[in-house]
A protein has these predicted regions:
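N-terminal loops that bind phosphate or other acidic moieties
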Residues: 1-54, 58-287
Length: 287
């Protein structure tokens, strides 16, 4: 019996950074294929719509791995399939082929960022380093991404300008891939969650607002949940405290108080292990 509700999936579950050790992070070899498998399962269940959360991905493959799992193929000049189409193999790809399942329902992407796919604010430049991309490799990743993005646009009959759509760079370009191949619609993730939990009324009645993130930086203020919450609270003239493992903000608005909870000498791995104690200590010290 076909389901009558929507399905919810996310990239972090199948293609996320949390699934890898630090030394395993390498966007040349990670793939979103598993995300496509999750979506296939939702399609098989007969859902009428899919909400895809695209935070926390370990990939920079433009969503090609997920699209590959769902039916698209990527061929070399001899007509042989390259699968999965990870960035390390992109130089071999000459053409995409195939289509997604005919019964693919509407896909809505809950997206917390407004980054385009390419450029200084793009997927690789902003989020590549946390996924293991070396600074010296950024130009090569950018060039490869631009070529594959153009191939996918041409295959789907979409304008190359799709590459510049705000949010297309989310999750290493997974948003771009699904916008291009599945006509996916982007939803501001922070707005979606805020509406679901009626955050506006809670903010209005609050005295102070406390939020947090692993690393609070300029990208946090480009649509991510904690940054969006802080920005709205400041608009309501609330005092906001942000507790984060690391703080790296270029400009700090008035009434926004930032607290880095991790000692400078502590390793990232130890910080993860000690996060609960560090946060408790920092809050007790402040309040």
């Amino acid at each position: 019996e076909a389901a009558t509700a929507g399905g919810v999936s996310d990239t972090a579950t199948a293609s996320g950074l949390a699934l890898l050790e630090d030394e395993e992070r390498d966007p040349w070899h990670t793939t979103s294929y598993g995300t496509g498998e999750l979506i296939n399962s939702a399609i098989e269940l007969g859902v009428e719509a899919i909400l895809l959360g695209v935070g926390g991905s370990a990939t920079n493959d433009l969503g090609l791995g997920a699209l590959n799992a769902m039916g698209l193929s990527f061929l070399d000049q001899n007509g042989d399939a390259i699968s999965p189409p990870i960035p390390d193999t992109w130089s071999q790809i000459s053409t995409p082929t195939g289509t997604l399942p005919a019964n693919t329902p509407p896909i809505h992407i809950a997206c917390d960022v407004d980054n385009p796919l390419l450029g200084p604010n793009g997927a690789a430049a902003i989020y590549g380093p946390q996924k293991g991309l070396l600074a010296a490799d950024l130009p090569r990743m950018e060039a490869a991404s631009e070529r594959l993005a153009a191939l996918l646009c041409d295959h789907q009959g979409k304008p190359h300008g799709t590459i510049n759509t705000p949010g297309a760079g989310a999750a290493g370009g997974i948003a771009f891939g699904f916008m291009t191949a599945a006509d996916a619609q982007l939803l501001p993730g922070a707005d979606f969650v805020a509406a679901w939990f009626d955050v506006e009324s809670h903010l209005a009645s609050s005295d102070i607002v406390i939020t947090g993130e692993g690393r609070f930086d300029d990208s946090s203020l480009r649509g991510k949940g904690p940054g969006a919450l802080a920005a709205r609270a400041l608009e309501l003239n609330k005092t906001v405290h942000v507790f984060a493992g690391q703080i790296d903000l270029t400009s700090v608005p008035e009434k926004l108080h930032l607290h880095a909870i991790t000692p400078a000498e502590m390793s990232l791995k130890e910080a993860f292990r000690s996060a609960s104690q560090l946060l408790t200590s920092a809050i007790n010290d402040k309040f």
